[in-house]
Amino acid sequence: ILKGIMDCMEQGPLTGSYARDVRVIVYDGKMHPVDSNELSFMLAARHAFSDAFKQAGPKILEPIYDLEVYVPADYMGDVMSDLQGRRALIMGMDSEAGYQKLSAKIPLKELANYSISLSSLTGGRASFTTKFASYELVPSDIQSKLIADHEAELEKDAE
């Protein structure tokens, strides 16, 4: 039973990503001398876990990073627009050593290719640092898309 549940958690019923912070309680079970074996218990556990997990109304979490961007004042508007398009939450701005320091929180997924984008926007005159901050809920519209994409991928693999 445990192996079936752990396998299901590793593959994640919603998007194929690891399911964390899950508590499972088995209330009842019977063993039949002919039909019971390790595989049947594992498959039953996987099926039960998947059904219960989806009924529990799970939410998808994404890693959020603290981002600090050091940018010349001339490029501040372009950099802020780019960050807002990446779902960043601007936390503040300061002036530091002739540069503007922009502080934000941003989903890790949105940092893909950020270095290239920032260099392109500023002619290579800006830099940034990141640090893991927390896990936050994915917005519901993005969660729905992630689930739909995963289901489509499963259907494609089944063909």
Model-assigned labels for residue ranges:
Residues 1-159:
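Accessory interaction regions appended to the cores of large information-processing enzymes
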